[in-house]
C-alpha cells in the first residue's frame, strides 16, 4: 500500500468532532496517517477522541476557512516530511462517508500512474458573479473537498501553500483557491483527473455530487456525499433539480448501505436550520390506515403553563392557543380526530428520528402568509428564550415546519429535560426547536385526501407563477438597462 498522509480539516460551531466526522476520520485511518486540523478549539471530549484516533492533531484559530487550515497543516508538516509520502490527501468535513470500502477508490486510481494529482469529483464551468471574479466565469475544476497530490508534484504544492493568502470570506475561498487550484497546477504541466466519471452529466448539472448524489453512490462508485445535501436552501435546490435528491439519498443510505446516516442527521440537527432539513428530507407523512392503538397523553393548559417532566417512552398531546380570523377557522378545521391522533402517534414507531408531529399547514394561502409573518414577529423572543435555556440554535428566515393547526404530538424521549413553561405563542415555537437541539426532527402529517388536494394547489400555484414570470423578466431587463445607462452617463 502507498504511504499516504490524509490532512482532514474539521470545523464545528460548538468545537465538536461530530459522529460523521469521527466516522470519516476513522475509516480514512485505514488507508493512511490522519493529520486532523480543526478551526477553533476542540471540546475536551472531542480533543481526547482526535488524539486517540489521529496521527497528529492541530487546533488553530478559526480564520481562513479551509484554505487557512490546509495552509497551516502543510507548513507545519514541512516539505521534507511531505516528500516521504507517496500521496497527500486534502479532505474536509463537508463530505460525509465513506459509504463502502474507500480503499477501492485508491486502488482504482493507482491504476493511473500518469496522473500527478486527482480528486473525487469535479465542478463544471459556469457563469457566476459570486464565485467567478471579474470575468464572472468559474472554470471546470476538482472540488476542494477531496484532492490527492502525488510526490512528484510536492515541491510546487508546498510552494503554493507558502504563497497562499487567507481568504476573508467563503466566496473568497472558492474564488481564489478552489476554482483556481486545478488550473494553477495544470498550467505548470501537471496532469489531473477525477475518480467519479460524470462527463455524461456535464450538460445537465454543473455540480453532480449535489444534484444526483444517490446516482453517484449507487452507480458510479463514489464513496462520499455532501452533508449539505440535507440542509441546502430548498428554494435554491428547486432551481437546479426536482427537489428529491436528499430524500432519495437518505432512503438509499438507510436501506441499501451500512452507513449510519441517522447519526449524521442527529449531528446536523442542532447546527442547521430545521426548515431546510425538513424540506429537503420531506418530513411529511400520510396518516397510516390503522386502528390507532397508541392514544397520546393529554397535557392540558394548566400543566403546560407550569412546565413538566416527560416519560421517554410516552407520546403526549399538546393543545395550542387558538388563532383568530380566517386563518383560525382553517387551523381549527385541520385539527385531527381522536382516531387520527392515535394514527399519527404510531408514526413515531416508524420514524425513530422524529420527536415532534403536527398537522400539516392548512391549504388556505393565508395560513402560510400569516405563519411567516408571525414567525418574523416572534423570532427575537424565541431566540431570547432559547438563549435563556442555554440552547443555541440557528434560526432561519423560514419558519420551522411546526407548530401548525391546533395541536402538537411529542415523543417524551425528545425532551430529556422536560418541557419548559408553555403559555404564549413564542413559547410553543420552542417545542420543535428544543427537540431539534436534542437531535430530533419535526414532521407534519395529513390524510391521503388532504395530500391529493395539496397537489392540486401546487399545480395552480405553479401555473400562476408561469403567468407572472414574463412580467418579472421584463421588469428585470428594464432595471438592468436603466442601471447600464446610468453607469455609462457617469463616465
Q: What are these model-predicted stretches?
A:
Residues 1-491:
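ER/Golgi luminal nucleotide-sugar-dependent glycosyltransferases, focusing on the catalytic module
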Amino acid at each position: 500500500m502507498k504511504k499516504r498522509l490524509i490532512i482532514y480539516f474539521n470545523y464545528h460551531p460548538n468545537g465538536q468532532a461530530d459522529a460523521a466526522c469521527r466516522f470519516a476520520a476513522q475509516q480514512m485511518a485505514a488507508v493512511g496517517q490522519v493529520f486532523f486540523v480543526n478551526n477553533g478549539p476542540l471540546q475536551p471530549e472531542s480533543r481526547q477522541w482526535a488524539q486517540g484516533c489521529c496521527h497528529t492533531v492541530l487546533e488553530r484559530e478559526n480564520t481562513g476557512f479551509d484554505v487557512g487550515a490546509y495552509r497551516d497543516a502543510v507548513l507545519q508538516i514541512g516539505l521534507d516530511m511531505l516528500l516521504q509520502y507517496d500521496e497527500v490527501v486534502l479532505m474536509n468535513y463537508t463530505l460525509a462517508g465513506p459509504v463502502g470500502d474507500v480503499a477501492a477508490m485508491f486502488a482504482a486510481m493507482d491504476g493511473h500512474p500518469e496522473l500527478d494529482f486527482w480528486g473525487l469529483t469535479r465542478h463544471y464551468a459556469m457563469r457566476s458573479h459570486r464565485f467567478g471574479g471579474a470575468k464572472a466565469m468559474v472554470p471546470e475544476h476538482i472540488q476542494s473537498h477531496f484532492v490527492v497530490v502525488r510526490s512528484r508534484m510536492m515541491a510546487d504544492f508546498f510552494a503554493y501553500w507558502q504563497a497562499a493568502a487567507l481568504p476573508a470570506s467563503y466566496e473568497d475561498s472558492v474564488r481564489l483557491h478552489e476554482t483556481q487550484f486545478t488550473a494553477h497546477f495544470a498550467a505548470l504541466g501537471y496532469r489531473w483527473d477525477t475518480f467519479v466519471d460524470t462527463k455524461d452529466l456535464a450538460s445537465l448539472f454543473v455540480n453532480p455530487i449535489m444534484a444526483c448524489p444517490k446516482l453517484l453512490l449507487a452507480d458510479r462508485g463514489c464513496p462520499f456525499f455532501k452533508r449539505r445535501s440535507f440542509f441546502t436552501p430548498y428554494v435554491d435546490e428547486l432551481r437546479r433539480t426536482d427537489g428529491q435528491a436528499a430524500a432519495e439519498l437518505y432512503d438509499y443510505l438507510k436501506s441499501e448501505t451500512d452507513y449510519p446516516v441517522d447519526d449524521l442527521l442527529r449531528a446536523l440537527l442542532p447546527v442547521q436550520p430545521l426548515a431546510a432539513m425538513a424540506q429537503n428530507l420531506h418530513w411529511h407523512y400520510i396518516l397510516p390506515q390503522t386502528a390507532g392503538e397508541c392514544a397520546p397523553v393529554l397535557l392540558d393548559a394548566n400543566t403546560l403553563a407550569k412546565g413538566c417532566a416527560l416519560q421517554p417512552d410516552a407520546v403526549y398531546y399538546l393543545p395550542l392557543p387558538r388563532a383568530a380570523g380566517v386563518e383560525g377557522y382553517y387551523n381549527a378545521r385541520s385539527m385531527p380526530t381522536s382516531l387520527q391522533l392515535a394514527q399519527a402517534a404510531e408514526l413515531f414507531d416508524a420514524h425513530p428520528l422524529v420527536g415532534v408531529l403536527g398537522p400539516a399547514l392548512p391549504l388556505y394561502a393565508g395560513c402560510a402568509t400569516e405563519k411567516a409573518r408571525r414567525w418574523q414577529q416572534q423570532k427575537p423572543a424565541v431566540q431570547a428564550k432559547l438563549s435563556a435555556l442555554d440552547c443555541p440554535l440557528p434560526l432561519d428566515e423560514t419558519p420551522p415546519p411546526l407548530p401548525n393547526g391546533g395541536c402538537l404530538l411529542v415523543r417524551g424521549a425528545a425532551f430529556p429535560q422536560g418541557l419548559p413553561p408553555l403559555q404564549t405563542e413564542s413559547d410553543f415555537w420552542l417545542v420543535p426547536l428544543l427537540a431539534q437541539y436534542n437531535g430530533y426532527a419535526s414532521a407534519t402529517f395529513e390524510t391521503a385526501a388532504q395530500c391529493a388536494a395539496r397537489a392540486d394547489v401546487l399545480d395552480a400555484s405553479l401555473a400562476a407563477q408561469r403567468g407572472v414570470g414574463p412580467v418579472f423578466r421584463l421588469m428585470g431587463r428594464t432595471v438592468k438597462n436603466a442601471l447600464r445607462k446610468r453607469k455609462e452617463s457617469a463616465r
